[in-house]
Amino acid sequence: MKMRCLVLSLLAATSIASFAQTATGLSPKWEELTGPDFITAIHQSQGVCILPFGIIEKHGPHLPLGTDLINVRYATEHAAAAEYAVIFPAYYFGQIAEAKHEPGTVSYSMHMQLDLLQETTDEMGRNGCKKIIIVNGHGGNEDLLPYFAQSQLQTPHDYVVYIYRWHGNYPGRPAEHSKIDMHAGESETAHTMVARPDLVHQDRAAQESGADQARLHLPQDVYTGIWWYARFPNHYSGDGSVATLELGQSDMKAYVGDLADTIRAIKADQTSLQLQNEFFEESKHPLDTKQ
């Protein structure tokens, strides 16, 4: 079984690299390009660059710490094989304070997260990435990244930041068997069975509980940072033991297709940067803005 998983993983990695390079003659991966090839790649991608955003955190007792990074890069690399874009190297400097009690979690300060992401997108922009798609592979970033995108209006930029998060809603999706599936559960385990089957230890998935402990009783409209720990102290939500390869393959195919379509749409978008420039110009003289 382990040998079969290793073979599947190696075949998947080989297919990504060969498909991407056959379609364009260039690797989509920033770190694999030479300096001269990087210039060609930026032109080939029409200035569209992707920042797949993962995290390092516990994923139940059965999935690797880098699950979010592994899966988001798998989807991004396959999408870039279908619609060429330059992919930034591994990035996992996001919000994961709620898992600091678990082994292996790497949690950076709020200021570090925002400063590093700003410096990274600035450097991407300086290198010709005028349309930067941050592909979010981690649920803990769902508030961080829209805020970051909104904060780009504070200072003029010659690039646009787009945030993409695939939510898995599509016709014909195989039925799930779990009532709760929020972290390291059925769907995420299924996705990793496709991206890195050799790192999935499904036989261990039932060693810890992924049930909602419901230890906090507050009004529905109240938010507090300890909510996740109150519900899922094992940092596990759902049941990875019921995951199937069928679900993983179906989801990943839909994910890759939707992301490839998104890359095409952003390549065609000429309005966002135009309006952003207009906004920056008007913001210099707000009293002159027509009322």
Predicted features along the sequence, with ranges:
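Bacterial N-terminal signal peptides
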Residues: V7-S18
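Extended, histidine- and acidic-residue-enriched regions that form the cofactor-binding/catalytic faces
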Residues: Q21-H111, D115-K131, G139-Q291
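Bacterial N-terminal signal peptides that target proteins for export
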Residues: M1-V7
